[in-house]
Amino acid sequence: MKRSSELGFASSSLLLPEHGGTGEEFARSNRQQWLEYVNAEIARYKKNYNSIILVGHSMGSLLSFLTYMESPEQIIGIVAIDTPLYVRVKGRALRNNLKVGFCKEIPESDPAHALLKASSVAPCSILTYLSWAPRMIDLFCLMKKTREVLPQVSIPTLVFHADDDELVSASSVKCFERTIPEKYLQLVHLKESTHFFYGNADWDLLYYTFSHFLQSC
């Protein structure tokens, strides 16, 4: 957001319904609420801005594509970061989530610390985590729906993929290449990054490529 403001763009970050609070609150949400909220917010912005670029990370990328397909008017670009079109959960991801859920303190040097900082839901009990099962099903439904609509994308799309992602399968990259027309797709590999942590060189690459994309839309 800071970089987009520096380039003269107005920017806003959305907090999905029942995110930013407790695990119990998150368990009560659902994908329909998330989609309706994002659609409503983008519709509100369209009243004030002629051109909008959607930027999302992880599930936020899925919602960006689905929002664009719902109402493409005035949306001139999409930036998708670590998009889970397909999932491949590595052991490292399980360890990090267990640490976030059950360790009182996580040092900054621990890879789990990046997950803790990025999480929009507070750590909770194991029973509460189990109650999230319907939300995981919601995520897979969003993944499937996004894969289905990608061939209809007809605006510039910048995709970042962390090559060491512990959650997103490399098959997601192949899906982008197979479905989005080549003239609209720009794909960037972040070779030293994970789903929540970005190496210094990758930060520089992301910063430069994102800036150029905004200015070219």
Residue ranges and their predicted role:
Residues 164-168, 197:
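Acidic catalytic loop of the alpha/beta-hydrolase fold
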Residues 56-60, 64:
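Gly/Ala-rich beta-loop-alpha elbow adjacent to hydrolase catalytic centers
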